[in-house]
Each structure stands twice: as C-alpha cells, then as structure tokens.
Amino acid sequence: NRPTYVPAPPRPPHPRL
C-alpha cells in the first residue's frame, strides 16, 4: 500500500527583490 500523500501547506509568495 502506498503511504497517504500529504501535500505541503501553501507558502506565501516571495517578495521580488
């Protein structure tokens, strides 16, 4: 059986430097 895939939580966009 495949382990349950847990997607990573959405991250805030990186500021344009």
From Swiss-Prot:
Keyword flag Secreted: yes
Report the locations given in the UniProt record: Secreted
Which biological processes are named by the entry's GO terms? Answer: defense response to Gram-negative bacterium; innate immune response
Query: What UniProt keywords apply to this chain's record, in alphabetical order?
Result: Antibiotic, Antimicrobial, Immunity, Innate immunity, Secreted
Question: Per the record, a Pfam family?
Answer: Apidaecin
GO cellular component terms, A-Z: extracellular space
The induction field says: By bacterial infection.
Q: What does this protein do?
A: Antimicrobial peptide active against many Gram-negative enterobacterial and plant-associated bacterial species. Not active against other bacterial species like H.pylori, P.mirabilis, B.pertussis or N.gonorrhoeae.
**Family per record:** Belongs to the apidaecin family.
Q: What is this protein called?
A: Apidaecin A
- Organism the protein comes from: Sphecius speciosus
